[in-house]
């Protein structure tokens, strides 16, 4: 099986992946009936990374799949290097596939002299040579406007709804919003599952203390019920 999925003479699809989670790319390739383009990737002793593709990609539509989890900064950098290599190898188009887009939570300034790092990430992908970005459930849908090109903003809600329907007794299930920012999405979940009861956690976050939030109470009926908490990331 070829690593290049042939279409019309001017249409070739190529899937490449970084080292963060190659198992996902293998499943995608299986669904597409193709193979992942072989890539030589390794780290130098000083921490720098090297990437080279073993087959030509000239004129191909290339999808670069990388999961931004674990060592997030390393995997974003590796994906940027892959994009640069593809651009210099004359790929026809380059699509970034990042199921979880790193730094998506940092989409606005809370205080003075803070960065908007989500915008920076989109700018870096554009500067490296990406033509399009495909991602799932951004922290805020408005982030699509950070990229100067098409953004395919997918949602996992249909898949997760099917799981909840099959795994839980909906007659004894409550949808829970973990904070004020997720109430709207939690209402959508409750409606799609048959107008389930909705609860809300009153939570406050101290922006001066990283990774710290304090829950002050919960509004709604959760006693003895299965709770589905609709958080973002």
Regions found by a protein language model. Give the residues of each.
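PRPP-associated nucleotide enzymes
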Residues: 1-233
């Amino acid at each position: 099986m070829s690593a290049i999925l042939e279409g019309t003479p001017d249409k070739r699809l190529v899937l490449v992946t970084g080292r963060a989670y190659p198992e996902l790319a293998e499943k995608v390739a299986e669904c597409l009936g193709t193979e992942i383009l072989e890539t030589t990737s390794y780290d130098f002793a000083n921490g720098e990374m090297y990437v080279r593709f073993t087959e030509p990609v000239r004129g191909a539509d290339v999808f670069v799949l990388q999961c931004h989890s674990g060592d997030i900064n390393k995997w974003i950098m590796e994906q940027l290097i892959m994009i640069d290599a593809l651009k210099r190898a004359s790929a026809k188009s380059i699509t970034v596939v990042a199921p979880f887009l790193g730094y998506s939570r940092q989409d606005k300034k809370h205080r003075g002299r803070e960065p908007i790092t989500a915008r920076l990430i989109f700018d870096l992908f554009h500067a490296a040579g990406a033509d399009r970005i495909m991602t799932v459930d951004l922290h805020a849908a408005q982030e699509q406007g950070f990229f100067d090109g098409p953004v395919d903003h997918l949602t996992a809600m249909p898949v997760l709804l099917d799981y909840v329907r099959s795994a839980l007794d909906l007659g004894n299930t409550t949808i829970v919003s973990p904070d004020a920012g997720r109430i709207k999405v939690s209402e959508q979940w409750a409606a799609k599952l048959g107008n389930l009861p909705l609860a809300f956690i009153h939570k406050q976050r101290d922006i001066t203390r990283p990774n710290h939030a304090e829950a002050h109470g919960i509004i709604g009926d959760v006693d003895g019920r299965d709770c589905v908490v609709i958080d973002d990331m």
